């Protein structure tokens, strides 16, 4: 059996945001005993990621690393009409990707103790983000 739902995550400022609980609240119940959850964000300037959920410094450090890797206002950018943060956001999105697949075991997301789901928002003002969640049983 396959179930699917679409929902919006609330708008976030630029940065890496722990959204595990916000996503979990939107998932249809009950989750299967064994299955897979695929999450897909329908945007090109943000990404989904799994990272450490305990120390908030990880979020700050990830933002700093990404900004160091992909800088704004580079003279070779041609796609600039949507602002100086837009082309770097597309590049960062391509590095991280727009989907995650998480195993479901015993009716729960089977993630490690220190793992959480992140929305990495690469725009200064990205707005709400549309997520498609597909559960495979």
Predicted regions and their residues:
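Active-site histidine-anchored catalytic micro-motif
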Residues: 1-137
